[in-house]
UniProtKB/Swiss-Prot annotation:
This is Urease subunit beta. InterPro entries: Urease_beta-like, Urease_betasu_sf, Urease_subunit. Its EC number is 3.5.1.5. Pathway: Nitrogen metabolism; urea degradation; CO(2) and NH(3) from urea (urease route): step 1/1. Coiled coil: none annotated. It is found in: Cytoplasm. It is an enzyme of class 3 (hydrolase). Keywords: Cytoplasm, Hydrolase. GO terms for biological process: urea catabolic process. Its main location: cytoplasm. It catalyses: urea + 2 H2O + H(+) = hydrogencarbonate + 2 NH4(+). It comes from Leptothrix cholodnii (strain ATCC 51168 / LMG 8142 / SP-6). The lineage of its organism: Bacteria, Pseudomonadati, Pseudomonadota, Betaproteobacteria, Burkholderiales.
Amino acid sequence: MTPGELLTDGADLVINSGRRTLTLVVENASDRPIQVGSHYHFAETNAGLSFDRAAARGMRLNIASGTAVRFEPGQQRTIELVDLAGDRQVWGFRGLVQGRL
């Protein structure tokens, strides 16, 4: 077994069940690849990504923990976001919130 490995019965795993989700179109308008991790506050991602940041406030990518999505230069893709849970406080990242949402 590899550290962090999950052994399942093979059935589909459901993540973030019951949480509000949002689908957005995101474009990498920069000249460099941009990668965003699973728990990064999406509204605070690299300024080279073009999307509705106000709509993404308080949300993260709806992907498995520890994974990421990569946006190549000029690439446009549709992503799904999910509400942050817990205390709904955001600290760090680009410093745009620094507290309660």
